[in-house]
Regions:
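AAA+/P-loop NTPase substrate/partner-engagement loops
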Residues: 47, 59-90, 97-102
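Walker A/P-loop nucleotide-binding motif
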Residues: 33-52
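A short helix-turn-beta junction within AAA+ P-loop NTPase domains corresponding to the substrate/partner-engaging
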Residues: 155-176
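Conserved AAA+ ATPase small/helical "lid" subdomain
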Residues: 181-234
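Short, amphipathic alpha-helical "recognition" segments used to contact nucleic acids or chromatin
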Residues: 28-31, 234-253
Length: 275
């Protein structure tokens, strides 16, 4: 399979680009109802991929779910046991980036991700003898969702999986991420502060809001300055903007002195960036 580049991210040619949460929910709802049997969801960290999937499938961390939800740190034999216990139920494998790298995981994923309705999964080792009810092979009709931050073809087995999947590249704009965050984030001061800088933020993460909340609640008066350094890719711009927000600096002379101390750059650079 060839690949295309989307803002420096390598993607399979047949990836479907999804740019808003409403459209993402349409695909997730179809998966939840069983209409889509095999989906690979790609997207950068901090945009709510996992939360959206859990909401669509009714997965609640506080109670038992009918969906098998597996994170990347799971061991291969543990994955096999989970697939047996949840056979014929939906399966979500999160953090596929880790699972990719383990050949034992890939050997399980290859038959699991077969496009046939009934898929035969096997574990050919003595480990199953320690779990009396666990067979060495079984058949399941589970539909499967794989979640990853990036797409990588490490070997032929992985490429074989890609050829079978509906591949979604979730790429919401910073405005869309900000809008979605309003549905759950309950700190107006932080929310509106982030919103005032959206046009300058190249890549927004929902984690930025939570980090700012932790800094502010810990008593850091300069939490806004710290947040800008996290969000803005140009550190010089972040420093200049942060200096305007520093309550301990009351005039330009103090700000310029602090700017040159932090960056080693000149007074002229300070005014150029500020402009």
């Amino acid at each position: 399979m060839t690949a295309k580049t989307n803002n420096m991210i390598l993607l399979p040619d047949d990836a479907i680009v999804v740019t808003n949460y409403n459209d993402l929910d349409r695909y997730l709802d179809k998966f939840a109802e069983g209409s889509l049997d095999l989906v690979l969801l790609l997207g950068k960290p901090g945009i709510g991929k996992t939360e959206s999937v859990k909401q669509a499938l009714g997965i609640d961390d506080c109670r038992q779910s009918e969906t098998l939800y597996v994170e990347g740190h799971a061991q291969p034999f543990g994955l096999y046991q989970g697939l047996w216990r949840y056979r014929n139920n939906p399966v979500v494998l999160d953090d596929l980036d880790r699972l990719y790298a383990n050949p034992d995981h890939v050997r399980i994923l290859k038959p699991l991700c077969n496009t046939r309705r009934a898929k035969r999964i096997s574990w050919l080792s003595n480990a199953v003898t320690g779990v009396p009810e666990l067979p060495t092979e079984f058949t399941t009709t589970s539909n499967v969702m794989l979640i990853a931050n990036e797409w990588r073809s490490l070997n032929g087995n992985v490429r074989a999986l890609e050829d079978r999947m509906i591949i979604l590249w979730f790429k919401p704009t910073v405005e869309e991420i900000h809008r979605k965050t309003a549905e759950w984030f309950d700190e107006p001061e932080i929310y509106h502060f982030v919103g005032s800088y959206l046009s300058h933020i190249p890549q927004l993460s929902m984690r930025h809001y939570e980090r700012a909340k932790r800094l502010r609640n810990a008593g850091f008066l300069d939490w806004k300055k710290s947040l800008l350094q996290m969000m803005l890719s140009d550190r010089t711009v972040a420093v200049v903007v942060g200096l305007q927000l520093d309550p301990l600096l009351s005039n330009e002379t103090q700000r310029i002195k602090q700017f040159t101390a932090e960056t080693g750059l000149s007074r002229a650079t300070y005014f150029r960036v500020k402009a």
